Regions:
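Positively charged n-region of N-terminal signal peptides that target proteins for export
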Residues: 1-4
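Bacterial N-terminal signal peptides
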Residues: 7-15
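Metal-centered catalytic cores of metalloenzymes
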Residues: 20-80, 84-176
C-alpha cells in the first residue's frame, strides 16, 4: 500500500513539473493585406516588403513570446504592433512589438530600421488600453481572447507608410 501511495505521489509530482506547452500562432505580412489608418483606409500597398510573426501564447504564465522578421520595405521601420481587428478591418493597437519612436511601454525593443528580426516577451505590463474596443491596460486575458479568436493582426509601420506598409492576420499554428 505504501508503495502505491508513493508511486502516485511521484507520478503527480512528475506531471506537475512538466513544462506547459505554449500555443503557437503566426502571421504572414504583406502589403496586399494592408488597409491603411483607422477611419482613413487607403487600400492595399504595392510593396516588395514581407514579414512573418511567430507567437507562443502561454496562458498559464500569462506571457506571449514573439519573433518578428521583415525585409524589403520601402523605407525605414518606425514601429510594429499587434492590433485588435478582423481581417480587412482596422483596429486599435493593444501590444507593441517594437518601436523607434520611443512611444512604446517600458522595455519595448527597437525595430531593426531596414529589416531584420526582433524578439521579445509580452506580459500584462505591455498591454495597452483601447477604450473604444473595451480593452483595459494590463488585461492579459484580453490578449488571450483576441489572439485565440482570430481577431488580431500584426502591422509594420514605415516612414513612407506611417499607417502601415505590411500587415498579416494572426492565426493558430505555425503556418501564418
Amino acid at each position: 500500500m505504501r508503495y502505491i501511495i508513493l508511486s502516485v505521489a511521484v507520478c503527480t509530482l512528475a506531471a506537475a513539473a512538466l513544462p506547459v506547452q505554449a500555443d503557437p500562432f503566426s502571421a504572414t505580412l504583406s502589403g496586399f493585406e494592408e488597409i491603411g489608418a483607422l477611419n482613413n483606409a487607403t487600400g492595399a500597398i504595392l510593396t516588395d516588403g514581407e514579414g512573418s510573426l511567430r507567437l507562443n501564447l502561454d496562458e498559464r504564465n500569462q506571457t506571449l513570446n514573439y519573433t518578428l522578421t521583415y525585409s524589403d520595405l520601402t523605407s525605414n521601420v518606425t514601429q510594429a504592433h499587434i492590433h485588435f481587428g478582423k481581417l480587412h478591418v482596422a483596429g486599435g493597437i493593444f501590444v507593441f512589438l517594437c518601436s523607434n519612436l520611443g512611444n512604446g511601454p517600458a522595455g519595448t525593443p527597437a525595430c531593426p530600421a531596414a529589416g531584420g528580426t526582433v524578439s521579445g516577451t509580452i506580459t500584462a505590463a505591455g498591454v495597452l488600453s483601447v477604450p473604444g474596443q473595451n480593452i483595459t491596460a494590463g488585461d492579459f486575458d484580453a490578449v488571450v481572447q483576441i489572439i485565440t479568436s482570430d481577431t488580431a493582426y500584426a502591422n509594420i509601420h514605415t516612414v513612407r507608410f506611417p499607417a502601415g506598409e505590411i500587415r498579416g492576420q494572426v492565426t493558430h499554428g505555425n503556418g501564418g
